[in-house]
UniProtKB/Swiss-Prot annotation:
This is Nuclear distribution protein nudE-like 1. Gene3D superfamilies: 6.10.250.1080. Belongs to the nudE family. The modification Phosphoserine is found at S215, S231, S242, S344. The keyword Kinase does not apply. It is found in: Cytoplasm, Cytoskeleton; Cytoplasm, Cytoskeleton, Microtubule organizing center, Centrosome; Chromosome, Centromere, Kinetochore; Cytoplasm, Cytoskeleton, Spindle. Transmembrane segments: none annotated. One of its GO terms (cellular component) is axon hillock. Residues 175-345 are annotated as: Interaction with CENPF.
Amino acid sequence: MDGEDIPDFSSLKEETAYWKELSLKYKQSFQEARDELVEFQEGSRELEAELEAQLVQAEQRNRDLQADNQRLKYEVEALKEKLEHQYAQSYKQVSVLEDDLSQTRAIKEQLHKYVRELEQANDDLERAKRATIVSLEDFEQRLNQAIERNAFLESELDEKESLLVSVQRLKDEARDLRQELAVRERQQEVTRKSAPSSPTLDCEKMDSAVQASLSLPATPVGKGTENTFPSPKAIPNGFGTSPLTPSARISALNIVGDLLRKVGALESKLAACRNFAKDQASRKSYISGNVNCGVLNGNGTKFSRSGHTSFFDKGAVNGFDPAPPPPGLGSSRPSSAPGMLPLSV
């Protein structure tokens, strides 16, 4: 009743019925609790009787174990006396056998020493063999990597040479476009001053110049295709006689500026690749003239490997890792930076 809210009653009969129902509910709960208590008491008495029976059995088993323990102690004493007697007899026999054993041990030590020397020599030979095999595999792997890297660099150099041609052609085309734009602007100014009533013809001339700049390719063409660019004079106006808007003219000029920026980026990248190729060539000549050492075994025996170390660096042969290649020039093909022309031609 502490947590329940007492409702409001409209009549005395409703209040009486409510309290009567509540009392019946509490009476039923009390009856259930009393039944559970009686059941719990009966279970407790049964458990207590069972535990008492187990206690009696445990005490009986403990007494039996104590009796067995006492009997085993007597047997141990008898066995100790018998063991001492046997030990005295065996000691005499052991003293006689030890003399024979000392002689056989001396012979055995000599044989063991000889066997250890043979095993050590065998281990040294096997270790030298494994080191030789591992070194040979490492040398072959590095040789293959060097060959692949050199082939890749040679292909890159070929691409750079073709890019030089394309870059020079782009420069020439851009220079021609700038000159032609300047000439046409001057012609347009002269025409505007001489004939101010004909703006449509001037617009058409400017549109043809802008269309010529729009027709230039943004990247060099690939190998096997003719690396030629159409002359601005030979490019037709794709819009017919309709003039271009000022935004189209600005876009065309922006394209020309982008071409010039890309050409400059290609020149800087080509210079870096040339410097790296020169470094690789000098490094290869230094390695081929200095690396010719072999692998030493455990006894100091030298195995000459001059025929396998001529293509590897001196640090790898002496047990040190070679210097890593410069960033961006690993086994995978480097990607072009954003806003630059691709290297493939």
